[in-house]
């Protein structure tokens, strides 16, 4: 294995940061050179992510391209990177949108362009680091680092209320971060590790969490991620951030940053706390449905085109959360697909709105009308992207929403009915907005002389439309790479599928996020052979386990990597506590309790801390 291959994730993570360092050494007046350097490093990063995507083996279980080296000894923090089907998608999305964001900002950013592109590339490093991290502390570090460049992108290059929007964005996110940090510290106290695979193993093998502790930890992580999504009722920061951010900031905020919330739910909440996830799932599904309907209704009455797109994100990401928490494999696949699809289509919508703002310096729908006459190419691109967001078949928005609605129906018909109503409402507010902007008579004389798309804008929009159509016509390459992730998460969520083996038992095969899978303890060989992830039942119909194809074994296990069922056997509560002395006082535990209490106090008052004179608009 070459050195480049062995450290490919490190290279793709820190290459944008290297570009930011190079820009820092360029003179402020060399604006053209700064833009080209930013584009070069973002394109190189994208090309490497494409290479990783095609080298990614969808038939292999577990993490790929792993990198691990010690960082701290006490506490044990490791520089641990790796990707699976879920994180590979999001790293590819980040690499895809960043160079397009650079191109979108090519002419619009003239004030302090050097600092702008430094922050943009630093933001890319933070986002990729979040998706590649497999150590809880490293994940938290990238999660926090990402806030700094986005704060400055909104606060310096935003619009009239940019400072208010930037502060609100940071306050909400920091409250969630405090909760998550408390949960991370508590998990370390229980498991003795920050390494995610080890934490998962130890939570399975030693039954370390009481039901009450699991509920509180789930809420700590879930609220942090729900704020980032944002899930109703934590959504109020998003419209302000979107409306005030520059176009590139809105593209990356909608396309990537919001996906950190849904990614965190899939990576941490569901695998780490399966019982609590099931317990809170009905409430979360209701909140997701409320977000779908509420976001659509509020978007319908928005006079500002950019704010309309912002509220559409609340509705679309409600679909993602619903798909994850109905616990159906097709719905979960649809949620992951919708994450990628939303990043492309909504990112394209923000690009289109930004291009229109550059021409008229207004986003009010009432200021337009009849633009299809003067901007025929622009209006054609806008129509295709709008139809993709609506969910028209053969475009990318249809696949994810269809899978989510189908899976929701199997869980509860009411979920599917409300989700389908959200699709109808999306068609209403998006097509109505398109009709008011592009059709009818030209009532404002300023609209008669607007220039149509130039070559740069046509290139950007053509790339987005090609991806939108490709994902809608042929989604299988994307769906195939997420199959093992969905199977492993579903296995982990089965309440009675947790393995509690005796420590003297031989090591057992791994499979994705779920390290141990239940087998038929009586040694029967089911016929016909079930597929990987399929339930295995006895003659009476009682579910006895799940089949998985294990392609990676634990060290020195000598296990045959053939399809097998892994036995389950209950163990006494507390087995494996020799990992850490439970009676020994842990100095980190009071800190965790303190952070939880502080965050609990901050959450309901975060909005009150913001400047009252700046408030306004529909919340």
Language-model segment annotations:
Residues 375-378, 430-503, 508-509, 513-514:
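Cytoplasmic/organellar membrane-interface segments at the starts of transmembrane helices
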């Amino acid at each position: 294995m070459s050195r480049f291959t062995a450290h490919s994730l490190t290279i793709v993570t820190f290459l944008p940061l290297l570009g930011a360092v190079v820009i820092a050494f360029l003179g402020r007046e060399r604006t053209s050179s700064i833009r080209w350097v930013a584009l070069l490093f973002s394109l190189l990063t994208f090309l490497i992510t494409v290479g990783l995507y095609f080298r990614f083996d969808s038939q292999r279980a577990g993490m790929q391209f792993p990198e691990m080296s010690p960082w701290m000894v006490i506490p044990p923090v490791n520089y641990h990177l790796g990707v699976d089907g879920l994180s590979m998608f999001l790293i590819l999305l980040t690499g895809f949108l960043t160079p397009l964001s650079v191109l979108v900002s090519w002419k619009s950013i003239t004030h302090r362009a050097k600092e702008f592109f430094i922050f943009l590339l630093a933001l890319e490093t933070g986002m990729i680091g979040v998706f590649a991290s497999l150590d809880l502390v490293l994940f938290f570090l990238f999660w926090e680092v990402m806030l700094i460049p986005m704060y400055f992108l909104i606060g310096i290059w935003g619009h009239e209320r940019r400072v208010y929007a930037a502060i609100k964005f940071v306050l909400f996110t920091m409250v969630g971060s405090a909760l998550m940090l408390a949960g991370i510290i508590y998990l370390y106290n229980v498991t003795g590790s920050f390494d995610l695979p080890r934490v998962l193993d130890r939570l399975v093998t030693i039954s370390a969490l009481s039901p009450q502790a699991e509920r509180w930890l789930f809420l700590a992580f879930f609220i942090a991620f729900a704020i980032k999504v944002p899930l109703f009722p934590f959504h109020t920061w998003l419209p302000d951030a979107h409306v005030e951010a520059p176009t590139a900031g809105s593209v990356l905020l909608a396309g990537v940053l919001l996906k950190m919330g849904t990614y965190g739910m899939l990576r941490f909440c569901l695998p780490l706390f399966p019982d609590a996830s099931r317990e809170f799932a009905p409430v979360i599904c209701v909140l997701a449905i409320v977000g779908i309907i509420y976001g659509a209704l509020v978007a319908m009455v928005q006079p500002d085109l950019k704010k309309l797109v912002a509220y559409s994100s609340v509705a679309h990401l409600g679909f993602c959360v619903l798909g994850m928490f109905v616990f159906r494999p097709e719905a979960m696949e649809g949620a992951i697909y919708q994450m990628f699809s939303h990043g492309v289509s909504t990112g394209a919508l923000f690009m289109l709105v930004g291009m229109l703002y550059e021409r008229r310096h207004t986003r009010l729908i009432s200021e337009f009308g009849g633009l299809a006459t003067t901007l025929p190419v622009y209006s054609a691109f806008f129509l295709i992207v709008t139809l993709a967001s609506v969910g028209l078949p053969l475009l990318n928005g249809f696949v994810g929403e269809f899978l989510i609605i189908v899976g929701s129906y199997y869980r509860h018909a009411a979920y599917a009915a409300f989700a389908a109503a959200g699709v109808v409402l999306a068609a209403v507010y998006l097509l109505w907005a398109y009709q008011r902007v592009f059709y009818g008579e030209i009532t404002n004389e300023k609209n008669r002389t607007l220039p149509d798309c130039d070559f740069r804008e046509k290139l950007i929009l053509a790339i987005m439309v090609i991806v939108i159509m490709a994902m809608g016509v042929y989604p299988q390459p994307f769906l195939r790479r997420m199959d093992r992730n969905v199977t492993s998460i579903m296995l982990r969520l089965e309440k009675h599928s947790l393995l509690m083996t005796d420590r003297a038992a031989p090591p057992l095969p791994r499979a994705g996020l779920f390290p141990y899978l239940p087998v038929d303890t009586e040694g029967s060989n089911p016929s016909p052979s079930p597929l990987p992830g399929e339930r295995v039942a006895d003659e009476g119909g009682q579910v006895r386990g799940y089949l998985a194809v294990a392609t990676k074994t634990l060290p020195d296990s000598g296990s045959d990597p053939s399809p097998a069922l892994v036995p389950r056997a209950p163990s006494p509560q507390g087995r494996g506590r020799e990992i850490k002395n439970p009676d020994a006082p842990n100095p980190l535990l009071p800190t965790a309790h303190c952070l939880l209490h502080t965050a609990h106090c901050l959450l309901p008052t975060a909005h009150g801390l913001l400047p009252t004179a700046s408030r306004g608009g529909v919340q």
